[in-house]
């Protein structure tokens, strides 16, 4: 049957159909191969936007640096990064004038956070550039490695566990003439296999100590590693994103804490809130502008787009902003906040893996690492790559490119929002001193601008003034990609506003379906997604019921758990039929055990185990909720778990779902192929750290400690705790004398071993 798609829309208002035009169904595009080319693009573009700035050389690292601040004022509409310091400071001053006490209060809040934050804050976050191994690592491992190296170089302030003390170590490490690090390496040798008599390659992992001089250490400390951003929809080209190392992370965290605190107090800021709270905030600004534009006034809204926001921002401007925001604050506080922008003014971008060459004729492949790009003959590359390399060569040092101007993606979202809002704030009539005035919304690089004026000329003049004011602080509104409409219809951060926000349901599409964690979590996440969309995204009851049926179908096909009385044959059907036949109360079987689905749109908030508990056979209950079941390795049992769901744009968001741990909550084991690579040593370190933490938690009831960082302080704590506990147990008669003396002996042995090490 042919369906003419336009018929579907006859009854749908146009603004509700917009979501069907989004590129959000199906798999998003992923990148393969290296990100080196994308990173070079970023570095070259950033320098191009600031090319009329001043060149200097960093005295410590020898890196050439371009400073566009207070550079020439733009004469055309091309994007440029020539922010003017005095303009930025003035915008800050006016922002403070309109919000008395805002900076002062935010500083006080931040100071409290700075003094209380623990080092383990840095274990949050995924991939982090690990400077000791010169590659990316999970955040916790990278932090442990950094602290381990600090300790072996006599830097121990961090053992207090406070983040601020760790940052003191970071500062001191930069003054050291050299630093000793431990690296992992791999030896290969050919040996004959006894069994098969064939030659095989045997790999052994070694650790070696290596000394790094001050210059090399500084380069590593200032390095941002780069990767390609994956799963970006609606784009033809990929782009590079940055992962900073541990030295930078802590300082950035404090700056962003301050900026977040300011954003929370600004009505035009789309950060840090999200979801319905954000919609309410936005609706308020629109309402204000529409009520104030009396019948005599026109009101227009620009759905704004900025050209290359990050590449035209400048860390030196952020330094100026922080200096202004923290005036009158204690010296130590001002210093700690100014370090992040200073480090970013001296940052180096690591070019990634380099290029892969292959010869079709000789079936050979070879990797050209980024370090070689400075010296390799360019005849091997195609035209466009050759141009990129030629351009970037003067900036290269040890396979990293000096990148002083520009901010890499996602580093200072909050602070750059403060800058954007400060320009929106200048639109008040008392500042424009004329008949037009503006207001708007800002969320990182996305903005919506609402301009009111008595006539069209006034609107045009207002937009022009906004455009030029932005240029003065390094913000480039794109005239090609921004569009203007009568107020009441616009888009901001993918929220579509049409006299109120329209649900953009297509954005949620990717998060429907089976997540693939395990049977228990998948069922729970699936129904929670449907429930959340009924609450937040206008998912109607009929559609929700259909979504639920499709989800159950999908779930059964994924886990091959069709109902016990079905005719469908799968690998599991024999076992499931057997279970079905011997179960008295068949309604009590979970869907993943071939039971019926009891969910409907009214009971989506109840975990399946709870929904069916009363209906289950007793022996089934006993098997299902049995912590001693040998086939299941359990996570800690928490009542609420977090799932990562993929909305269509923006980062993966965390979604809470009810977690009832059953024998279906299994955890898949890690892929073994990593065990044959040079990363094996790293993996062993990570497991060792994990084991040590678990052991530590056995010693200390969870209330009495905060998770420690680094291994040696943990050992001391456990030994002394063991001694105290043993003495108490011995004196109260819970353990015998022999046991007591054995424990004491073990403790002494451990201490002896540590002294020898």
From Swiss-Prot:
Span(s) of short sequence motif Nuclear localization signal: 187-195, 203-216
Pfam families: Flu_PB1
Name under which the protein is recorded: RNA-directed RNA polymerase catalytic subunit
Residue numbers spanned by region Promoter-binding site: 249-256
Record text on subunit structure and interactions: Influenza RNA polymerase is composed of three subunits: PB1, PB2 and PA. Interacts (via N-terminus) with PA (via C-terminus). Interacts (via C-terminus) with PB2 (via N-terminus); this interaction is essential for transcription initiation.
Superkingdom of origin: Viruses
Keywords, comma-separated and alphabetical: Eukaryotic host gene expression shutoff by virus, Eukaryotic host transcription shutoff by virus, Host cytoplasm, Host gene expression shutoff by virus, Host nucleus, Host-virus interaction, Inhibition of host RNA polymerase II by virus, Nucleotide-binding, Nucleotidyltransferase, Phosphoprotein, RNA-directed RNA polymerase, Transferase, Viral RNA replication, Viral transcription
The organism of origin for this protein: Influenza A virus (strain A/Kitakyushu/159/1993 H3N2)
